[in-house]
A protein has these predicted regions:
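Short hydrophobic/aromatic-enriched beta-strand-loop microsegments
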Residues: 142-145
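PIN-domain endoribonuclease scaffold, especially VapC-family toxins
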Residues: 2, 25-35, 39-105, 111-118, ...
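Glycine-rich nucleotide phosphate-binding loop and flanking beta-alpha elements
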Residues: 11, 132-133
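A conditional alpha-helix N-cap/helix-loop micro-motif detector
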Residues: 16, 106-107
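Metal-dependent nucleic-acid phosphoesterase active-site entry motif
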Residues: 1-21, 46
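Conserved SAM-binding loop
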Residues: 106, 125-126
């Protein structure tokens, strides 16, 4: 299996959440780093920063987790920088949206992650977002979380 994780899954590896135990358990079983695109970089890092705004963590915890994210990317233990054809991803996202957004209610960001998974040739999709799970299944991806 070649998994692709959205930001909800990756953030659960860095911030203590209800879903953290499931995310950590998957990574221990899987044992391979997950693709990490520039879109992930923006979304994951911003989610960690927003946790300070929402009072879930303090600024020092945010700084520590952002540093750990960078270490993990450098070590390629959990995540690996992954180049991607953004034009192809946007086209795939539009195709997915045209076929399913009216019935599944997916947002553009949801479509973007599913399209990226398809473009990277992944066959498994990791998310804690219910709408995204439905879209990933509709795109033919196995949803395990």
């Amino acid at each position: 299996m070649k998994p692709y994780a959205d930001a909800s899954f990756i953030v659960a590896l860095y911030l203590q959440q209800e879903s953290s135990k499931a995310a950590t358990a998957f990574m221990q079983r899987h044992g391979e780093p997950l693709p990490f695109t520039p879109w992930h970089r923006l979304e994951v890092r911003n989610a960690i920063r927003l946790s300070v705004f929402h009072g879930l963590i303090d600024a020092s915890q945010s700084k520590s987790q952002l540093k750990q994210l960078d270490v993990d990317l450098q070590d390629e233990t959990l995540l690996v920088h992954t180049p991607i054809d953004w034009v192809a991803v946007l086209r795939e996202a539009e195709n997915l949206g045209a076929g399913k957004s009216e019935t599944l209610g997916c947002r553009s960001g949801d479509l973007f992650h599913v399209a990226a998974a398809v473009e990277l040739g992944c066959d498994q999709f990791l998310t804690f977002d219910e709408r995204q799970k439905k879209m990933a299944k509709a795109a033919g991806l196995l949803v395990k979380i």
